[in-house]
Amino acid sequence: MTIQDLKKSENFFLLAGPCVIEGEDMAMRIAERVVKMTDKLDIPYVFKGSYRKANRSRLDSFTGIGDEKALKVLKKVRDTFGVPVVTDIHGPEEAEMAAEYVDVLQIPAFLCRQTDLLVAAAKTGKIVNIKKGQFLSPGAMRFAADKVVEAGNSQVMLTERGTTFGYQDLLVDYRGIPEMQTFGHPVVLDVTHSLQQPNQTSGVTGGMPALIETVAKAGVAVGVDGLFMETHEDPTVAKSDGANMLKLDLLEDLLVRLVRI
């Protein structure tokens, strides 16, 4: 798969799925439903699921069902529904392993400056989606993208996921979307993570899911190339990031409203 495949529709493309792979059955149910709604709306779709969550607030937080088991779930989604899949990697040693199962390697925001990680992802030949660090300006992301390109891989996407605003909040500066697009790579808006409220004293990240539609509409209106949204059948029992995920039952109606913009 190439980035050109994601740009085949006049609509934005969508990266969506659970924050982390919690089990095969749930992942397959979510994928099946999102595939049906995106096919109907002519939205190019990439199934999203982290095979492991390396960045959790507390040691006792859920991190995954096991690397190989979760990666095999992602491969089953791809093989069953014929859609590409994306997952995060956290160190250079993970790039080649994950690339055997997925189509897009995602670089977490906190790791977006890690040269060895970016180069390792680039060398797999997969699409590399680099999330903008909450601490970086949009302009600084040019250098992260250049690392991947200079390592021999032009298949790069950049994702806006909010900028730190005080100790426990994030804001999206929509000016950054067209600015990053000038670098020559598609730009994605991570709607749900942009609504996180991190660093809570409870050790569990908060969120403002009621604003998902507002943030998504603004991104589409600005002209973002793709949207990233984590979704779950019941966010209240999700094992990671439930506080800012979109309930799956609400996704199709939201997409209908977004494609009208």
State each model region's role.
Residues 7, 125, 129-231:
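Catalytic alpha/beta core domains of metabolic enzymes, predominantly
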Residues 15, 46-48, 86, 106, ...:
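Conserved beta-strand positions in the central sheet of alpha/beta enzyme cores
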Residues 15-27, 45-67, 231-241:
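Glycine-rich, proline-tolerant flexible connector loops at the mouths of alpha/beta enzymes
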Residues 20, 109-111, 212-215, 222-244:
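Glycine-rich phosphate-binding active-site loops on the catalytic face of alpha/beta enzymes
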Residues 32-41, 60-86, 121-127, 177-187, ...:
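Alpha-helix-loop-beta-strand connector modules within alpha/beta enzyme cores
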Residues 65-66, 80-94, 103-116, 127-138, ...:
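Catalytic beta/alpha-barrel core
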